[in-house]
């Protein structure tokens, strides 16, 4: 099998086109159209949103290609889909469908508990989750063109996304102050490629776009993550598990765009109906926390 590969620079550029935007999880063509009309920059095609995956338990796999193709036919914006961690054949299938981006996602049950997908083998850009700088740079070293916080998906609780965003940024700040001779030890300490550690030290940021994901449920949540310094947001269960998905979708897009304007955020937050029911993180057993998946 011959694989056409896109260069990492090209794939990174495709991901940068989504900067400042909102990516919404959708399970039907109708939801995809709502997301597009609300101003989403892309949609994530799924059979079940993370809250339903969490509630159902069992093994969560790649969505049925028919579901993905119907969503792709319904909208003109880019469509993403999820593959299991390490499941390179699911990724090959998604690429063959013509998907725009692949999310190697901890929301699905990992297929490989030792290795992630070698993303350099694919022409389609990959997005991967990270809780810290080491995870982010390992994924980029494997070819990821976009990073997102892991958060804790399907909870409607933004606390873990905040923790992961702050952790990455804190480690970047620390790295930029290190003398050059200490960079190799730092790379060893966090388990990251030395060349990428040096690049981050020189630029003061990740070499790819960094979005927030996992628990974003309100316009204020989205604005919070943007003010913390991320490049955009993923919203999973927070829209279509709420009382008024259309209004909430538009409000989250507006809050992401005008994240530094509390008056706009206040205005779009009015009369949105009930948000999704949230889950306190300490009530989730450690073995059921999706953020722990991957390494």
UniProtKB/Swiss-Prot annotation:
Residues annotated for D-ribose 5-phosphate binding in this entry: 25, 154, 215, 236-237
Keywords: Lyase, Pyridoxal phosphate, Schiff base
UniProt enzyme class: lyase
PROSITE patterns per record: PDXS_SNZ_1, PDXS_SNZ_2
Molecular function as annotated in GO: pyridoxal 5'-phosphate synthase (glutamine hydrolysing) activity
Catalytic activity field: aldehydo-D-ribose 5-phosphate + D-glyceraldehyde 3-phosphate + L-glutamine = pyridoxal 5'-phosphate + L-glutamate + phosphate + 3 H2O + H(+)
InterPro entries named among the record's database cross-references: Aldolase_TIM (IPR013785), PdxS/SNZ (IPR001852), PdxS/SNZ_N (IPR033755), RibuloseP-bd_barrel (IPR011060)
EC number: 4.3.3.6
Pathway assigned to this chain's UniProt record: Cofactor biosynthesis; pyridoxal 5'-phosphate biosynthesis
Gene Ontology biological process terms from the UniProt entry: amino acid metabolic process; pyridoxal phosphate biosynthetic process; pyridoxine biosynthetic process
Active site: 82 (schiff-base intermediate with d-ribose 5-phosphate)
Sites where the protein binds D-glyceraldehyde 3-phosphate: 166
Domain of life: Bacteria
Family label: Belongs to the PdxS/SNZ family.
HAMAP family reported for this sequence: PdxS (MF_01824)
Chain's role: Catalyzes the formation of pyridoxal 5'-phosphate from ribose 5-phosphate (RBP), glyceraldehyde 3-phosphate (G3P) and ammonia. The ammonia is provided by the PdxT subunit. Can also use ribulose 5-phosphate and dihydroxyacetone phosphate as substrates, resulting from enzyme-catalyzed isomerization of RBP and G3P, respectively.
Record note on quaternary structure: In the presence of PdxT, forms a dodecamer of heterodimers.
Protein name: Pyridoxal 5'-phosphate synthase subunit PdxS
Gene behind the chain: pdxS
